[in-house]
Structures are given as structure tokens and as C-alpha cells.
Amino acid sequence: MMGHGDIDQLITMLARLPGLGPRSARRAALALLRQPESRMLPLAHLMERAATRVKTCSLCGNLDTVDPCHICTDAGRDRGLICVVETVGDLWALERAGVHRGVYQVLGGTLSALAGLGPDDLNVRPLFERIEEGGVREVILALSATVEGATTAHWLQERLLPTGVTVTRVGHGVPMGGALDVLDDGTLAAALTARRSL
């Protein structure tokens, strides 16, 4: 790139991060390099600390510095309500929204024949173990509105049916502020199918 080994390696590593292309990576590298004391060194220290301290929660699959994670050990959480998500990023998004007061199960992906991901590749065992222990009333499937998300939701629903717990799925359809004429056919169909009375 620029003929400077260390700088090129920094840009290359930054460009591997989701959402950062080569141009954004160069800008980020420049911002870090221009202020090494106030930006780069603190960031490097935090990244090193996170790499050694952050672990995956053995109960739900969340990332935290403790295992079980803070959500799983929070006495104020409703353990009878489990929200199943694909990724830790999905869990964090729901936490930011502040609407779910139960616990979670992070699958780590979805079923995908194309990607070669089957049921054994998903983190579902802890979910079924918690259900077997008793006290779980409802499992909310908060999976993406994709073919893989729908396939995974259907597979989970079939496995959960014999347990007697209520299985629900998050609503899909028209987003807040969304105009109908700009939505794709699949979104409109999902919105009409998932309609509810007022």
C-alpha cells in the first residue's frame, strides 16, 4: 500500500473488521497514528485486556468478563422467558432497546445448507437443558427475516413443541416510519400475514 510495513499491516488488519473497507481503514489508521498517546495506546491496551478477559457465557452464549454473564446472573431477570437470537450483536441490540427483561440464548448462527451449518453447529443444547430444568414458560424466536432465519425458527419450533413451552416469534413487517411503496414484496407479505387486531 504505502510502502511502510507496520502501517500497511495496521491498515490491513483494520480493513478486516466488519463495516471497514480499505478507505475507512486508512482513515482510522491515520487517526490512531496521529495521536498515539491518546488514541492508539489506550485502544491497544483495551484490546489486549479484552482478548484475555472476555469469555463466552456457558449458559447463553453472550460475551462478558464473567461466566455466567451479568444478564444470566441478574436476579431481576425473568428466567421463564428466553429470547433466542442468532448473534451476540443481536442480543446487544435488544438490550439497547430495553424491551426484553428475560434471558437469552445465542445460537451463533442459523441453519444453512449453503454454508454447511447444521443443528450440531448451533448453540442449542443449553436452551434445551434450561427447559428440562423447568420454569421456562416462553421461548421467543428473534431470528432474522431470511430463509435461513425462517428455517432455523421452524426447526426450533418443531423441537420445542413437545416441551410444552409457548413458542413465539418476533413480528416482521413494516418498520416504524416506513412507507409501503418502498418495501419489498416479502416484507409486505410478512406484514400482512402477521397483522393483529386493534
From Swiss-Prot:
**GO terms for molecular function, please?**
DNA binding; zinc ion binding
C4-type zinc finger positions in the chain? 57-72
Q: Which SUPFAM superfamilies does the annotation name?
A: Recombination protein RecR
Toprim domain sequence ranges: 80-175
List the SMART domains hit by this protein, alphabetically. Answer: TOPRIM
Cross-referenced Pfam families:
RecR_C, RecR_HhH, RecR_ZnF, Toprim_4
Q: List the keywords (alphabetical).
A: DNA damage, DNA recombination, DNA repair, Metal-binding, Zinc, Zinc-finger
> Could you tell me which CDD domains the record lists for this protein?
TOPRIM_recR
Iron keyword on record: no
Q: Does the keyword DNA repair apply?
A: yes
Instruction: Give the PROSITE patterns listed for this entry.
Output: RECR, TOPRIM
User: Which domain of life, per UniProt?
Assistant: Bacteria
Name the NCBIfam families for this protein: recR
Function recorded in the entry: May play a role in DNA repair. It seems to be involved in an RecBC-independent recombinational process of DNA repair. It may act with RecF and RecO.
Family label: Belongs to the RecR family.
Q: Name it.
A: Recombination protein RecR
Q: Which organism is it from?
A: Gluconobacter oxydans (strain 621H) (Gluconobacter suboxydans)
